[in-house]
Design a protein with these regions (language model features):
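Accessory beta-strand-rich segments of carbohydrate-active enzymes
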Residues: 2, 6-127, 154, 170, ...
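N-terminal carbohydrate-binding accessory modules
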Residues: 153, 215-232
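Short, hydrophobic beta-strand segments
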Residues: 61-63, 193-204
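Hydrophobic/tyrosine-rich beta-strand signature of extracellular beta-sandwich/beta-rich modules
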Residues: 76, 165, 214-216
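Short strand-edge motifs at loop-to-beta-strand transitions and within beta-strands
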Residues: 12-14, 55-59, 180, 188-196
């Protein structure tokens, strides 16, 4: 528009009731991004602060005592004023790109089993946490795929689960599948590393941006209790 972006504080308020079907699950609010500095208040109590506007962050409702059926008031303070303590670190009028303000990406309510894959950012492990996929010995003939999956047990009792990882092509055809068991004490989290070899891989390039899918499942017996898909 040719105008300067709005700079300064902004407030958001949301009333909600935690759905009854989340009973026995761990519930978090996942913010994809909000620009600048954010302070979160739950039912009038300051809960946490987050700096920076490009990475997601979460608010753990369960850890803050919210249970299924509870009525909640969430207040979010955001401020995209110039601040050297987080990127971009310079005055906005010197930037050659639009600098957002407020909550500019989606916010999700996520309910998980007490035994589940961790959040990659909340885990605070470099090169780990959540589902971390990396590669080695890549050529047109073969590629080694390594999948690290971190699982946490928030239950009050020890649990034994199976981590099942399936690699598929873009059409959903199964290429490789690997599974392994984890035993977790209450409050414990562990990682499992699984290796798969892909023959004649379709390599990504700007001209052929082909992506495979890594499907992760946490199983208790024959029942899937958590999971997700990572595009690689």
């Amino acid at each position: 528009s040719g105008c300067r972006n709005y700079q300064g504080p902004a407030w958001y308020r949301k009333h909600f009731v935690l759905p009854a079907e989340t009973k026995g699950q761990r519930v978090v609010l996942h913010f994809e991004a909000a620009m600048g500095k954010q302070i979160l208040y739950l039912n009038g109590k300051r809960i946490q602060e987050h700096l920076g506007g490009y990475l997601p962050f979460t608010l753990d409702l369960t850890a803050n005592g919210v249970q299924a059926g509870d009525s909640c008031l969430l207040a979010v303070f955001t401020d995209n004023s110039d601040d050297k303590s987080y990127p971009p670190g310079k005055r906005q009028y010197t930037l050659d790109f639009a600098y957002h303000g407020g909550i500019y990406r989606d916010v999700w309510m996520i309910a998980k089993s007490p035994v589940a894959i961790t959040d990659a950012i909340d885990s605070q492990i470099v090169g780990g946490g959540g589902v971390f996929v990396h590669f080695d010995k890549i050529s047109e003939k073969s590629a080694q795929v390594y999948v690290n999956t971190e699982v946490q047990n928030d239950d009050a009792r020890s649990e034994s689960v199976t981590v099942e990882t399936t690699l598929t092509d873009a059409d959903g055809k199964v290429i490789k599948r690997s599974s392994g068991k984890l035993s977790l004490k209450p409050g414990e989290k562990k990682s499992i590393r699984q290796q798969m070899e892909v023959k004649n891989p379709t390599l990504w390039s700007p001209d052929t941006p082909y992506l495979y899918r890594v499907q992760s499942r946490i199983k208790k017996g024959n029942k899937s209790i958590d999971g997700g898909i990572t595009r690689v």
